[in-house]
């Protein structure tokens, strides 16, 4: 509502699974903390997890048995592109000039003062520069002679071909480092934690895809 844009937010609920006693303790602690802060989180037993999301295998003789889980029913997903578009339009309405496909190549300085930035579309004169480039923030800061205490790691996700509706919530598991939900078009949206290595790469790798699929199965 604040940005006056449909970000396609779907309040389908988010469920975190517990696979061992430490998971159970941690998730119950999180549930209590949420409720103390007015958030309507609940802890589910194994049977309640199965009832809420029937596709989950709750057999107790598998490698990572489900011992329970937390559920926040008002949580959900938003279309990431729509969120970016909404913020962009809101910024535009506030007078921000957004230049697309314009890469910063360098920051022109005079001593400790910034005079402007060199881009693929020419020089932009300015005395102030804001760095909001996520994982590449340290690269831009280095152009100004600053070293940020950051480590950038790839975070990969993938989608399947569209399939019939099988899951109407978001399921996450810290033990296997994976999450899965289903888009409106039927694709399974699957992701995991960050890669083990430090990198600025924006390319995917087959071993991560294989490991992520193994995790959700």
For each feature predicted by the language model, list its residue ranges:
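A general structural signal for well-ordered alpha-helical segments in protein cores
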Residues: 1, 24-27, 46, 83-84, ...
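Dinucleotide-binding Rossmann-like beta1-alpha1 core, especially the glycine-rich loop
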Residues: 1-55, 198
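Short beta-strand
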Residues: 6-10, 150, 171, 180-181
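Conserved hydrophobic/aromatic beta-strand scaffold that supports enzyme active sites
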Residues: 16, 116, 157-159, 179
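A short, glycine/Asx- and small/polar-enriched loop/turn
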Residues: 22-25, 51-66, 108-115
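Helical element adjacent to the flavin cofactor pocket in flavoenzyme catalytic cores
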Residues: 69-128
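Central helical "cap/lid" subdomain
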Residues: 119-168
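Active-site lid/adjacent beta-loop-alpha segment flanking the redox-cofactor pocket in flavoenzymes
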Residues: 162-217
